[in-house]
């Protein structure tokens, strides 16, 4: 099988060069009191200076080495500079100990050539330590439509999966279906009442039932199928539950697909409660049995460190405190029934047994209390499997009130009866913004920040709307390239244009600034993946659009086709490169469309 061509991470490239210079200087005894062992432990840092006068990249590591070396930072930087092997890159010592790097034309040309050659694969890199990762997100109850918060987890989870894959990891995406417990019984009861109401009976919904109008639609579909002879009318609560469950799950899957969110696995909680054909034990019972054998369970009237309450009965506790939780947790009540935590334990045991090296769960802020107990569940079964829990804040929708002219929060939906659904956000005639805008704005902030979603801005067809601005930038590239091919008969080429002196023929600062921005794609993806920060790619896309439009406005192409064809060709290749990077970011990472005309 052919090896996948990979992109160059400029940060990793420079980091490796500085690390090698530290090793060489240390072996030559030129770094003062720094030992070879200490030299091997130095992890260089590469930054992009805020002022381009200080180079394209900078390394402040000599400043941090001063104490170990017992040398002045500037002296360390000068020593490392002598041992750097970076053809095509100029280095200088500045700022009392910084190593500054300026990429030369030959090096930039090689990287631009790589970008044009790799095309839709540009940005993909190998991970230094690739992992097999299970990423779980959304995981909603199949009792109602998905809400906007679920949409945020869907957008973040699917984008994070793309980021991890592009940066060299094997990722599987999973949706945990909460299809067991009392909520499912209530769903079936609610559907039965709606069916009886449609049949003319005067019967009220119980107070704790599901009141959304979506169940009326499901009841109508059920009666239509009964009338058509497709199925008989349910006669048991379980049959009503099963029909409602199938309808709701299908609806949720359709909504997620509409939002361009796919899953590799749909894991049913019911599997954890079903007895194993061989042992007769459910997955929950097997998990607790293993915890008992490992010494992590005990029976008591109160958790360790607390006095029993009057009349308390014995329950089975899990020693979650040993894994950092604030107190031990009940997994089996005195009556023999299992807690929700018991199912979570069995589920995470199943994840561990499937052989993943890292588990990532994306949860809403109302699940903050689960962090300690889930870490305990994974740690008890395997100290080697890493668990990350990403907690995200919720979303509020705002729209201008036509009567007052003020922004007001949109709380209610005609479709669901009590909240704005994800379907409403996508395609409701009054508040819908479409898939691209929904994904963009749901991805636009750090997960730990609440989102105030401006519905008016999301549908605005001006450059105030960042989705429109980035889409327009891609379409502008495509339109110009089409015109060059169709009207000007220019043949596009992926071979980088250089002068006779093997220099890039650029004349304006906007050209170089745009190229550096485009070449940063691999590092932008690596940083966003490592920091679990998809919103950083939103910022990167906005920066590309801004740099490209500055370039487009200041660096003309069409008049140069005859006046200076070499410069024109070099600028055309920057347009090609911009189109490619925007396409990769929009479609490959963010899950948006990339329009070719607007």
Swiss-Prot record:
EC top class, as a word: ligase
What Pfam families does the record tag this protein with? Answer: Arg_tRNA_synt_N, DALR_1, tRNA-synt_1d
Name the chemical reaction catalysed here. Answer: tRNA(Arg) + L-arginine + ATP = L-arginyl-tRNA(Arg) + AMP + diphosphate
GO CC annotation terms, alphabetical: cytoplasm
Subcellular localization, as worded in the UniProt entry:
Cytoplasm
> Which GO biological process entries does UniProt record here?
arginyl-tRNA aminoacylation
The record's annotation in PROSITE patterns points to: AA_TRNA_LIGASE_I
Return the NCBIfam families for the record: argS (TIGR00456)
The protein in question is named Arginine--tRNA ligase
């Amino acid at each position: 099988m052919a090896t996948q061509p990979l992109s160059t991470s400029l940060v990793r490239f420079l980091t490796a060069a500085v690390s090698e210079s530290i090793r060489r200087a240390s072996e030559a005894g030129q770094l003062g009191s720094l030992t070879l062992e200490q030299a091997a432990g130095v992890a260089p840092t590469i930054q992009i200076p805020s002022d381009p006068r200080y180079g394209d990249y900078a390394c402040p590591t000599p400043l941090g080495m001063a104490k170990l070396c017992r040398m002045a930072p500037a002296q360390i930087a000068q020593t490392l500079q002598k041992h750097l092997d970076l053809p095509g890159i100029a280095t200088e010592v500045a700022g009392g100990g910084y190593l500054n790097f300026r990429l030369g034309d030959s090096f930039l040309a090689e990287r631009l050539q790589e970008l044009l050659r790799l095309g839709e694969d540009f940005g993909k890199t190998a991970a230094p330590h690739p992992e097999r990762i299970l990423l779980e997100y959304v995981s909603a109850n199949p009792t109602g439509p998905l809400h906007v918060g679920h949409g945020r987890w869907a957008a973040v989870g699917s984008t994070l999966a793309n980021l991890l894959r592009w940066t060299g990891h094997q990722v599987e995406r999973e949706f945990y279906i909460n299809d067991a417990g009392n909520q499912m019984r209530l769903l079936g009861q609610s559907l039965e009442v709606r069916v009886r109401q449609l049949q003319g009976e005067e019967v009220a919904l119980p107070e704790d039932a599901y009141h959304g109008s979506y169940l009326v639609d499901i009841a109508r579909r059920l009666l239509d199928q009964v009338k058509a002879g497709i199925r008989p009318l349910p006669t048991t609560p379980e049959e009503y539950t099963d029909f409602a469950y199938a309808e709701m799950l299908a609806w949720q899957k359709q909504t997620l697909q509409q939002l361009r969110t796919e899953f590799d696995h749909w894991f049913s909680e019911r599997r954890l409660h079903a007895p194993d054909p061989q042992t007769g034990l459910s997955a929950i019972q097997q998990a607790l049995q293993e915890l008992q054998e490992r010494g992590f369970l005990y029976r008591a009237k109160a958790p360790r460190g607390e006095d029993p309450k009057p009349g308390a009965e014995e329950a089975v506790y899990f020693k979650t405190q040993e894994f950092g939780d604030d107190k031990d947790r009940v997994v089996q009540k005195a009556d023999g029934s299992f807690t929700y935590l018991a199912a979570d334990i069995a589920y995470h045991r199943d994840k561990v047994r499937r052989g993943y090296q890292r588990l990532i769960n994306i949860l809403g802020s109302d699940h903050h209390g689960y962090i300690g107990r889930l870490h305990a569940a994974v740690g008890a079964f395997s100290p080697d499997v890493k668990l990350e829990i990403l907690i995200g804040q919720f979303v509020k929708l705002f729209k201008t009130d036509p009567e007052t002219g003020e922004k007001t929060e949109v709380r209610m939906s005609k479709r669901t009866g009590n909240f704005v659904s994800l379907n409403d956000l996508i395609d409701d005639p009054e508040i819908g913004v479409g898939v691209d805008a929904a994904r963009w704005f749901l991805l636009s902030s750090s997960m730990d920040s609440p989102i105030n979603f401006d519905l008016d801005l999301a549908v605005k067809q001006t450059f105030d709307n960042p989705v429109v601005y980035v889409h327009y930038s891609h379409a502008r590239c495509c339109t110009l390239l089409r015109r060059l091919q169709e009207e000007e008969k220019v043949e596009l080429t992926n071979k980088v244009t250089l002068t006779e002196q093997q220099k890039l023929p650029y004349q304006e600062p906007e050209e170089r600034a745009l190229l550096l921005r485009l070449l940063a794609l691999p590092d932008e993806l690596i940083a966003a993946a490592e920091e679990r920060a998809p919103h950083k790619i939103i910022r990167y896309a906005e920066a590309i659009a801004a740099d490209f439009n500055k370039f487009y406005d200041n660096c003309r192409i069409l008049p140069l086709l005859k006046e200076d064809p070499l410069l024109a060709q070099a600028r055309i290749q920057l347009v090609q490169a911009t189109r490619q990077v925007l396409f990769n970011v929009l479609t490959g990472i963010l899950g948006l469309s990339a329009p070719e005309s607007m």
